[in-house]
Design a protein with these regions (language model features):
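Solvent-exposed coil/turn segments that connect beta secondary-structure elements
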Residues: 4, 21-23, 87-89, 102-106, ...
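Amphipathic hydrophobic-ligand
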Residues: 10-17, 92-96, 140-142
Length: 184
């Protein structure tokens, strides 16, 4: 696995990574030398993680806090919903909402499903501020994301290639766009 913090086109700063599982190598020592290009892999996963700072930058919310809506412990578990707290543009004070996280035809959709703590008269501003869409094909995932989730206070978008061959671009997390045409 290779992981790096990087400036991601669109979202801003986040962590990008590539993981490979169940490699079939002619010589197992190749793994120690990092010579895996051309090997069969059960799974190659590209992942982008955005914390409250990175995702808040996208939303224009400088004080964004993200948590699992059902388990607010630091580990938080995995969820397809998130509890977000922050001051959306145009609001006077922070609000707390639960949002759904969905992928439809390669586009990430975030929609408020529950208003938990919102100042009177700011409901529509908060609903608008926590509504967001992002075309994941523009991210360094090598194609559209096939999973979105909240894990431990960060959003994760990922794309899996199953039963594939490791390519040179798989060794660099930010090279994902170069594999777009080959795997769609």
């Amino acid at each position: 696995m290779k992981r790096t913090d990087a400036d991601i086109p669109g979202p801003g700063v986040g962590t990008v990574s590539v993981e490979m599982f169940n490699l079939k190598l002619d010589n197992p020592a190749d793994a120690l030398r990092g010579e895996v290009v051309g090997a069969d892999a059960r799974l190659v996963r590209r992942r982008i993680r955005l914390d409250g700072v990175g995702f808040g930058e996208l939303l224009g919310i400088t004080d964004l806090d993200m948590a699992n809506p059902y388990d607010i412990s630091p580990a938080g578990g995995v969820a397809s919903e998130a509890r977000l707290t922050g001051t959306v543009p145009g609001a006077r004070e922070p609000a707390t909402v639960v949002v759904t996280l969905r992928l439809v035809n390669g586009t990430f959709h975030m929609r408020p499903s529950q208003l938990i703590n919102v100042a009177a008269g700011e409901e529509q501003t908060v609903l608008d501020g926590f509504t967001f869409d992002l075309d994941t094909r523009e991210l360094p995932l090598g194609g559209p994301a096939d999973l979105v989730q909240l894990r431990g206070g960060s959003f994760e978008l990922s794309r899996d290639r199953v039963n594939t061959v490791v390519e040179p671009a798989d060794l660099e997390p930010l090279a994902g766009a170069s594999t777009l045409g080959k795997h769609d």
